[in-house]
Amino acid sequence: MAKPVVAIVGRPNVGKSTIFNRIVGERVSIVEDVPGVTRDRIYNSAEWLGKEFNIIDTGGIDLSDEPFLEQIRAQAEIAIDEADVIIFITNGREGVTDADEQVAKILYRSNKPIVLAINKVDNPEMRDQIYDFYSLGFGEPYPISGSHGLGLGDMLDAVRAHFPKEEEEEYPDDTVKFSLIGRPNVGKSSILNALLGEDRVIVSDIAGTTRDAIDTTYTFDGQDYVMIDTAGMRKRGKVYESTEKYSVLRAMRAIERSDVVLVVINAEEGIREQDKRIAGYAHDAGRAIIIVVNKWDAINKDEKTINVWTEDIREQFQFLSYAPIVFVSAKTKQRLNNLFPLINQVSDNHSLRVQSSMLNDVISDAVAMNPSPMDRGKRLKIFYTTQVAVKPPTFVVFVNDPELMHFSYERFLENRIREAFPFDGTPIRVIARKRK
């Protein structure tokens, strides 16, 4: 079940980003210290009263080259397409403006729940000024102050009340769910169509449990698959095609519902920052990952080209050192037959559970070979390790003091675990806990 999506919409300078940061809170500042993981605050996770959701800050989208009305229209279009609930932000100090009414006209047509929030109501005396906003036609306005954090609780209560009811996935546990993600025009649709063109593939399109998604179910060599596709691959909106940042929004829902994510790169264009950003979301979500370099037929090659590309990918995607790389051509179908076996392999690894005795032997040998360094006269002591989860495989290491588990030593233990067990294609998590 994908998390609900909330979009913050409003004309420029009403405080959208301030409210976004208030709602997201400290999560924005959590940055993994790994080269290549690029953070973009346009999209983040948040929680209210135990319910997690994703939130889009349309104010983080740079449309400065577009005319003013086009900026507003584009922001509203994102919200209408992507969100389950829309927060419409206005400025209480300025009253209802023509631009607010323009936004309202677009939002009327969305048929989405809309919570109207009046920002910059910084003291109780200003509450009398909110009544004009009833004229926008969205019911009770919620007075808030993004800068002081006032009124956000009532607003979020209203947002949470509009979340769609949770639905269980309707697919058997042994079905492998995967998605293709990447920038526009990297060839995701072409790869999908080439895969579905195989004789042994049985295709049926059914509506997915997630709004605006189409799940393609099919069977290949006796294994059932679900290709999770957001509308972005099938419905090409002008705004989405023209601005690469929007492809991240399209990818997020697919990532959340997938077991395996194929990150598609265009060989003709090379590696772009947006490729790394999208891949970073899949990594952070803990999904199994395959890097697929498409349009391999379209570039000049010699016997060294694959090695040069592989080294470049490993350098630029250091956080995906575990992900296998496949060089394919959707046009000629070169190496496409490798994808299904690889999807199966990384899916199996993603859900692999290892024996505790073997795991602890591996950790003991690792510590004996390379004890942790001293820190302020103290040394990390590992008592035992246990696997607490799969998808992704997650290991808790019980220690004398978690503060002594440095990032570099955590990475060392992860590498020893990878050497001992088949975890190709899947991230693994190593968490230090104090033994009680």
Swiss-Prot record:
Q: Where is the EngA-type G domain?
A: 4-167, 176-351
Which annotated residues bind GTP 2?
182-189, 229-233, 294-297
- What species does this protein belong to? Listeria welshimeri serovar 6b (strain ATCC 35897 / DSM 20650 / CCUG 15529 / CIP 8149 / NCTC 11857 / SLCC 5334 / V8)
Q: Show the NCBIfam families listed in the entry.
A: GTPase_EngA (TIGR03594), small_GTP (TIGR00231)
Q: Which residues bind GTP 1?
A: 10-17, 57-61, 119-122
InterPro entries in UniProt: G_ENGA, GTP-bd, GTPase_Der, KH_dom-like, KH_dom-like_a/b, P-loop_NTPase, Small_GTP-bd
Q: Per its UniProt record, what Gene3D superfamilies does this chain match? A: 3.30.300.20, P-loop containing nucleotide triphosphate hydrolases (3.40.50.300)
Q: Which UniProt keywords apply?
A: GTP-binding, Nucleotide-binding, Repeat, Ribosome biogenesis
Gene Ontology biological-process annotations: ribosome biogenesis
Residues covered by the KH-like domain: 352-436
Q: What is this protein called?
A: GTPase Der
The source's superkingdom equals Bacteria
* Subunit comment: Associates with the 50S ribosomal subunit.
Family, similarity comment: Belongs to the TRAFAC class TrmE-Era-EngA-EngB-Septin-like GTPase superfamily. EngA (Der) GTPase family.
Q: Per its UniProt record, what CDD domains does this chain match?
A: EngA1, EngA2
**Molecular functions per Gene Ontology:** GTP binding; ribosome binding
Described by its record, this protein's role is as follows:
GTPase that plays an essential role in the late steps of ribosome biogenesis.
Q: What is the lineage of its organism?
A: Bacteria, Bacillati, Bacillota, Bacilli, Bacillales
